[in-house]
Design a protein with these regions (language model features):
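Conserved beta-strand positions
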Residues: 6, 43, 74, 112-115, ...
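Short, acidic/polar
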Residues: 20-33, 88-105, 153-157
Length: 309
């Protein structure tokens, strides 16, 4: 797959999210990504209550000549209706959810079907068996996971191995210069088990892309949720200093740092402008020196993990 994956959460539901784009506004951005060599696209059934999957499917069918020329990923877990079986990772929900996603995406298979969260209410053996059945049926090519604690991910992999079921091939998790808690256990676990890590939010929702005090809408929202601390200012300062020395946007330096981790296979990137795509693709070719990496990392202060539940 391409080392940049275009996250499709930003497309399909402008009425629900102020920063979401409709199909017409999303088309030139996705087209720019395709022209730049991006072949990996990630969405979820709950993004825009299914609207993102619909837009994703329509755009990719229009921009690619063959279905085999791109990798399509989506996710399952969050409620998609009011009923007791309309969410979670039970066999019943997974089996109905995958068919609904296939219909919205307009395809006969999903390349990477990811569980969006850990489901404490469903035995992991039931979840892994359902995913294995989807792979055997040809509806899904590979199974992936997202946002778990390392012990949960290890438990899932062990359950699959113990019962001869399909194992997860990927872990999508938060990882950037301002949130590095996954370096403790998850990234080493994935490296040891040869599982591809797919970091999302490499720019901390736009905070690391800013060149000055003016925030993006999502960066302002992040500050409003108290995710950022005063200690992050030193990291941001080092990032901007290195970017200035290189004559590059801070976004390229921040994404280059994420991509440089040996466990990372591809980075999930959201884009609401074509320039966001350009920065992400250019970051693939940015090689940071050991001294630059040290400067970017030395000011980090550990924090409590979040986002797994």
């Amino acid at each position: 797959v391409s080392r940049v994956a275009l996250g499709m959460m930003s497309y399909g539901a402008p009425s629900a999210l102020s920063w979401s784009l409709d199909r017409d506004r999303a088309e030139p951005i996705v087209r720019r990504a395709v022209e730049a060599g991006v072949t990996f696209f990630d969405t979820a059934d709950m993004y825009g209550d299914g609207a993102s999957e619909k837009v994703t499917g329509r755009l990719l069918r229009a921009l690619f000549a063959r279905r085999d020329d791109y990798v399509l990923a989506t996710k399952v877990y969050y409620p998609m209706g009011p009923g007791p079986n309309d969410g979670g990772l039970s066999r019943k929900h997974i089996m109905s959810a995958v068919d609904a996603s296939l219909t919205r995406l307009g395809t006969d298979h999903i390349d990477l079907y990811q569980v969006h969260r850990w489901d404490a209410e469903t035995p992991i053996e039931e979840t892994m068996a359902a995913l294995d059945d989807l792979v055997r049926a040809g509806k899904v090519r590979y199974a992936g996971a997202s946002l778990m604690y390392a012990w949960q991910f290890a438990k899932a992999q062990h359950a699959a191995e113990r019962h001869g079921l399909t194992r997860f091939v990927s872990m999508q998790t938060r990882f950037n210069l301002l949130y590095r808690e996954e370096e403790r256990e998850m990234l080493p676990l994935c490296a040891d088990q040869r599982v591809g890590v797919l970091p999302y939010s490499p720019l901390a929702r736009g905070v690391l892309a800013a060149t000055g005090p003016r925030d993006t809408d999502r960066a302002a929202a992040e500050r409003g949720r108290s995710r950022l601390t005063d200690g992050d200012d030193a990291v941001i300062g080092a990032l901007r200093a290195i970017a200035a020395e290189r004559g590059l946007p801070p976004a390229q330096i921040a994404m280059a740092w994420t991509l440089a981790h040996p466990a990372v296979s591809a980075s999930m990137v959201g884009a609401t402008r074509t320039g966001h795509v350009d920065d992400a693709v250019a970051a693939v070719d940015v090689a940071l020196t050991p001294e630059e990496k040290s400067r970017l990392e030395e000011h980090y202060r550990p924090r409590a993990p979040y986002g797994h539940t």
